[in-house]
Structure formats: C-alpha cells, structure tokens
C-alpha cells in the first residue's frame, strides 16, 4: 500500500477519508530500502537521537514552523487556549491546552469515553488481536504489561488503541472516574507508531517505552491505562495526583513532541464497545475520534 493511501473513518461524518501522512517519503525510505531499515533501527534504539530532536523543537526559532503546520494540516486553532503568537516554540504549541468547552465529555456513569484525540481500533476480545500477528508471532500481552499476573487479568478481556498523529491534540485524559494509582514505567525503545510502520510491526507496543496506570472504578473494574512513547517523543508527562479520585475527562498528562499511542485494557465482561467502532475495526479501519466521545458502555448481564 502506498504511503498516501492510508484510510480511516471520520466518526463525525461516517465517511472514509484519506489520512494526511507526515514525512511519507522518509517513511517509505525506512520501510522499503535495506539502508533505511538499518538506519531506522539504530535511530529508534538510541534515545540520544530522540532527545536531540526534542531539544531542537524547544528552540525559539521553531515557533516560525507553527503557522505553516497549522495551515497544512488544517488544525482548528480556535480551539486552543492561547493564540498562536503566545507559543514560544513548536513543542510549546505541540503540548497546547484547549479551551474548556472544546471537548465536551459524554455523560453517564456507565459510559467510558475516548481518552484522547486520535485514530481508534477496538478489540472486544483479545483473541481479535490475531489480525495483527506478524510472521506468525502473536501480540504478547505479558510482554506489553511486563507483569504475568497483571496480563492474566486482561487475557480474556477487551482492548482499545488510540493512535495520536503529530497534528493531533497531545494531552490525554481519564476515560472513566475512579481511583488512579501511580504509573509504572517500562523502559524501552522509541519505534515509530506511524500507521505504515504499525501495519508492518504491531509488536512495537511491547518494545517501546511505556507507562501503566491502573484505574479502579465501580462500573468498569480495574482498567489498565497505558501510554506508549514513539519516535521523537522524548518523554511522557503525567499531570495528575496518583492515589487520588479522578473525574472522567480530567487531564491525565501529555506527550512531548512527536506522535504516540494510548492503550486501554478492560477485564472480561466490563465494557461493550460502541457498534460503529467495532464494525470499522473488524474491517481493519481506524476511526478518528475526539477526546470525550463515547467509547463504550458498562457491560450489564
């Protein structure tokens, strides 16, 4: 599939649209050439490269990149909490906050909402992940969570994946209300979660740097909330207070410059994902959603 043929479903319109691929030529070089694949592996395994790129994006000169970026990727700047001229660097804009009413939160204690802006895939059963085996190597939940006992709790459960593109709003939020534990970090590499890369290797989720937070709620039980770092994402920043009660839709943290992913894991018989998300995911199509929209409802027998 060509780099410019990545399709997704716009949830608000229900139409299939073409994703605006960033650096498609470079990605094709990394994927399709031997030299590119070797260079890509070296860069992703070297955290210094990611730190240098992140440092560069914090330079004041990068503020001149903001307006062309907004125009090219049709970012709605009216939603931002601050005007463009207030951002001191590109990274400052990248981690921008939105106006309080920019992302309405779907109400109801029995409703779990989307935790971030991004492209979503949902798996009502972990067995559905067989769609993403690469070279007959299945996705390993144990490797992903780094804890056999924790993995056992979700082995028969459900999973939702939100892939954030560089042009997305990069603050992530709580999908449910409950008690949020302190995050546990698993160190790893920073492979790209570019859609073309992800189609080639779903296992990057078990190899990349990530942080795991358990949220305990009455309706949804213990939900594992996992932030996965990606190429050029130097750090995952948590802004909530561990051990405290959190409200649905409250900010949890943000990703520094780059694109990244949020993964939600649910125990068995805890959530019924919305039918449209299930249907599109079964077709291999991501659904582009905004933070705060309905992801699914509490499972009731």
Swiss-Prot record:
Cofactor: pyruvate
Modified residues (Pyruvic acid (Ser)): 260
Subunit structure: Heterodimer of a large membrane-associated beta subunit and a small pyruvoyl-containing alpha subunit.
InterPro entries according to UniProt: PS_Dcarbxylase, PSD-B, PSD_type2_pro
Predominant cellular place of this UniProt entry's protein: membrane
Gene that produces this protein: psd
GO annotation, cellular component aspect: plasma membrane
Site residues by UniProt (Cleavage (non-hydrolytic)): 259-260
Family from the record: Belongs to the phosphatidylserine decarboxylase family. PSD-B subfamily. Prokaryotic type II sub-subfamily.
EC number(s) stated in the UniProt entry for this protein: 4.1.1.65
Active site, renumbered: 117, 173, 260
PANTHER family associated with the record: PHOSPHATIDYLSERINE DECARBOXYLASE (PTHR10067), PHOSPHATIDYLSERINE DECARBOXYLASE PROENZYME 2 (PTHR10067:SF17)
Keyword Magnesium in annotation: no
Superkingdom to which the source organism belongs: Bacteria
Cofactor note: Binds 1 pyruvoyl group covalently per subunit.
The protein's name in its UniProt record: Phosphatidylserine decarboxylase proenzyme
NCBIfam families, per database record: PRK00723.1 (NF001941), PS_decarb (TIGR00163)
GO biological process: phosphatidylethanolamine biosynthetic process
Residue ranges crossing the lipid bilayer per the database entry: none
Compartment list: Cell membrane
Gene Ontology MF terms in the entry: phosphatidylserine decarboxylase activity
Top EC class of this enzyme: lyase
Reactions it catalyzes: a 1,2-diacyl-sn-glycero-3-phospho-L-serine + H(+) = a 1,2-diacyl-sn-glycero-3-phosphoethanolamine + CO2
PTM text: Is synthesized initially as an inactive proenzyme. Formation of the active enzyme involves a self-maturation process in which the active site pyruvoyl group is generated from an internal serine residue via an autocatalytic post-translational modification. Two non-identical subunits are generated from the proenzyme in this reaction, and the pyruvate is formed at the N-terminus of the alpha chain, which is derived from the carboxyl end of the proenzyme.
């Amino acid at each position: 599939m060509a780099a410019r043929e990545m399709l997704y479903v716009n949830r608000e319109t229900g139409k299939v649209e073409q994703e605006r691929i960033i650096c498609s030529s470079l990605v094709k070089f990394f994927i399709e050439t031997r030299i590119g694949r070797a260079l890509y592996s070296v860069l992703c395994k070297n955290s210094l490269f990611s730190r240098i790129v992140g440092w560069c994006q914090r330079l004041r000169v990068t503020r001149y990149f903001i307006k062309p970026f907004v125009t090219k990727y049709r970012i709605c700047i009216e939603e931002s909490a601050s005007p463009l001229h207030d951002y001191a660097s590109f990274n400052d804009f990248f981690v921008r906050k939105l106006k309080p009413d920019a992302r309405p939160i779907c109400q109801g204690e029995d409703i779990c909402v989307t935790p971030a802006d991004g492209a979503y895939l949902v798996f009502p059963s972990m067995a559905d992940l067989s769609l993403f085996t690469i070279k007959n190597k299945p996705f390993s939940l144990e490797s992903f969570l780094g804890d056999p006992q924790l993995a056992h709790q979700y082995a028969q459960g459900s999973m939702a994946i939100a892939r954030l593109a560089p042009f997305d709003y990069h603050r992530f939020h709580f999908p449910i209300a409950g008690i949020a534990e302190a995050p546990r970090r698993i160190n790893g590499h920073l492979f790209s979660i570019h859609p073309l890369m992800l189609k080639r290797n779903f296992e990057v989720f078990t190899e990349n740097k990530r942080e795991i937070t358990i949220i305990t709620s009455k309706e949804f039980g213990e939900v594992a909330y996992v932030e996965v770092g990606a190429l050029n994402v130097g750090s995952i920043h948590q802004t909530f207070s561990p051990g405290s009660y959190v409200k649905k839709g409250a900010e949890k943290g943000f990703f520094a410059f780059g694109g990244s992913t949020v993964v939600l894991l649910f125990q068995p018989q805890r959530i019924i994902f919305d039918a449209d998300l299930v249907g599109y995911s079964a077709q291999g199509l991501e659904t582009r959603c905004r933070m705060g929209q309905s992801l699914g409802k509490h499972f009731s027998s």
